[in-house]
Amino acid sequence: PTIILMFGDHQPSVEQEFLDKAYGVTQDQMTMEQYMGKYKTPFLIWANYDLPDDEIPTTSLNFLGQYLLSYAGIENSLYENYLQNFQEVLPAMTFVGYIDQNGKAYSHLEQNEYTTLIEDYRTLAYDNLFGGHSRHAQYYQAPQ
């Protein structure tokens, strides 16, 4: 069996004047939803076996691996379970901001009910990527 995930990591660069006309507002007048929309890119998961016909809702790059593991039938680590639960509350998160389960977009500069949740996520993601010897490996390993 083969499964492939393809995605774009950014939209092509275009002049700001073009974007202002396309959105009908200048960048400083955009809503957070419009601003985050500038960074949307398509993705595709393909396999040489049947995949569920489920439509994947709004998501972000940091969560695509969850779908890939699920479709491949691979059991989650504790960290991946955490990401799955996190995504139910905040289904998309980028360097610009994040979107909650109701579709409302927020800037990372805002302090709100999600601030602590995001700080916890960042701590765990940092530990996973850069924890070195202090990394809590058992949290990130796939079950045996």
For each feature predicted by the language model, list its residue ranges.
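Solvent-exposed soluble domains appended to multi-pass membrane proteins
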Residues: 1-144
